[in-house]
Amino acid sequence: MKIRVPATSANLGCGFDSVGFAVNLYLDLEIIGPSERWEIIHDLGAEIPQNDKNLVIATALKIVPELAPHKIRITSNIPLERGLGSSSSALVAGIELACLIADMNLSTQVKLQLACSMEGHPDNVAPAILGGLVISTYHEGTLEYVKLAMPEVGLIAYVPDYKLSTVAMRKVLPQEMLFREAVCASSISNVMIASLLKGDMVKAGRLIEQDRFHEKYRTKLIELEEIREIAHKYGAYATYLSGAGSTIACLAPIENTDKIVEVLSKHSNANVMKLSFESNGVRTFG
């Protein structure tokens, strides 16, 4: 059996911890067979455990503590700790792994609830499970969501050659914000979502770049403004910090994406990728 989970990009505009979409990078997991102990084959680096400390296995064991050990193979082209949902993809793979080995037929809603209870917020795990663009809220243990299709728009990921820990990047955020700022953020997010629904990427782009929650605190470490200026010079609708970074995502007219990729690739040592939106969430094969 095989499991495939897409990468995700989240935190569009003021949709902090709420708005995310799936993209065409993947974590792939193959169940090779039963084993005396958990054994994970991968070439993702020495920092990724190859035993039951691996996030995929640790997640599966949270759901089914007595889950029988297996030998599995993991491959992934999702950049690690770069704001493209690498940890969420591992968590979702772990939920699916538990379901397959224990022969549990959990509903999508139950899987979403499990993922949110572990992750704490739905912006990455929801599109990883559902695919597409997902608008969601997780409050007092209850998840509500709407899955949408993204408008026809090009997507570029500017992936710097340095990692940023989500935990560390959350520590730089304030614990509170002024009421008037919260009202402003709410109204910006409302119109941004409405613009995406109408396919008005010009208006949506303006609003995506009016984040009030995290970018101004996190971009002291990331070259967002510089990349934003370059991208707009070549016709981009919007740039934003994907997740906690370090990836900067760029939305642009499809016909402009190749030029933006070319220009940004010459700018630094970052890995610049032209991506596409993934309508499918986690899938199993075989």
PLM segments and residue spans:
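Phosphate-handling active-site elements
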Residues: 34, 65-71, 98-114, 140-144, ...
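ATP-binding N-lobe of GHMP and related small-molecule kinases
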Residues: 1-82, 100, 104-106, 275-280, ...
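Short beta-strand-to-loop capping motifs
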Residues: 33, 160, 250-254
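Anionic-ligand binding region
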Residues: 134, 138-144, 163-194
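DPxDG-like acidic metal-binding loop motif
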Residues: 25, 84-107, 129-134
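Glycine/serine-rich anion-binding loops at beta->alpha junctions
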Residues: 5-17, 76-100, 120-123, 238-246
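Glycine-rich, charge-dense phosphate/pyrophosphate-binding loop(s)
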Residues: 196-286
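Alpha/beta catalytic cores of group-transfer enzymes, especially the acyltransferase/condensing modules
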Residues: 106-152, 239
